[in-house]
């Protein structure tokens, strides 16, 4: 496996919501981090996004517990003023949130962004790969 990865929100949601056919690969990616094979990171803004998205499936108390657990498993890379300004200046990204994910991955020193939306990162400085590609490394 590789040294450091940033796990995109969609992969985390695949795991938390057991979305098929993506759940098994997402589970294996997360397991590689919990077992110490890889250092995994999530962007801090992914937590707030997931708190909102998960509201249909979990109570507020359950969401707090689930997301707190993720924060103990993974390193969390925050968004500061410099990352925001860098992201805002980057006109190549069509999706600002993806640009912020890339900024977090870059700051963390990630080798890869593990995502199901590889095409969203076509202009990223950090290579984006599918969970299945990551598992094959």
PLM feature spans:
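Short, conserved alpha-helical segments within structured domains
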Residues: 42-46, 83
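A general alpha-helix detector
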Residues: 11-12, 49-50, 86
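Active-site neighborhoods of divalent-metal-dependent phosphate/nucleic-acid chemistry enzymes
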Residues: 75-118
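Short, well-structured N-terminal submotif of metal-dependent ribonuclease cores
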Residues: 1-41, 55-62, 123, 136-137
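Short, flexible helix/strand-to-coil boundary loops that buttress conserved ligand/catalytic motifs
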Residues: 16, 88-91, 125
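Acidic, PIN/NYN-like endoribonuclease modules and their adjacent C-terminal/linker elements
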Residues: 2-4, 106-137
């Amino acid at each position: 496996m590789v040294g450091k990865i940033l796990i995109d929100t969609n992969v985390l949601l695949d795991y938390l919501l057991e979305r098929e056919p993506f759940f098994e690969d997402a589970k294996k990616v997360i397991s590689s981090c919990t077992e110490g094979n890889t250092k995994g990171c999530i962007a801090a803004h992914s937590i707030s996004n997931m708190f909102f998205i998960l509201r249909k499936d979990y109570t507020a108390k359950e969401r707090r517990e689930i997301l707190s657990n993720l924060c103990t498993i993974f390193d969390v890379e925050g968004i500061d003023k410099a990352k925001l300004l860098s992201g805002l200046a980057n006109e190549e990204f069509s999706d600002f949130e993806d640009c912020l994910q890339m900024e977090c991955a870059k700051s963390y020193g990630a080798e890869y962004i593990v995502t199901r939306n590889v095409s969203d990162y076509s202009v990223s400085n950090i290579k984006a790969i599918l969970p299945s590609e990551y598992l094959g490394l």
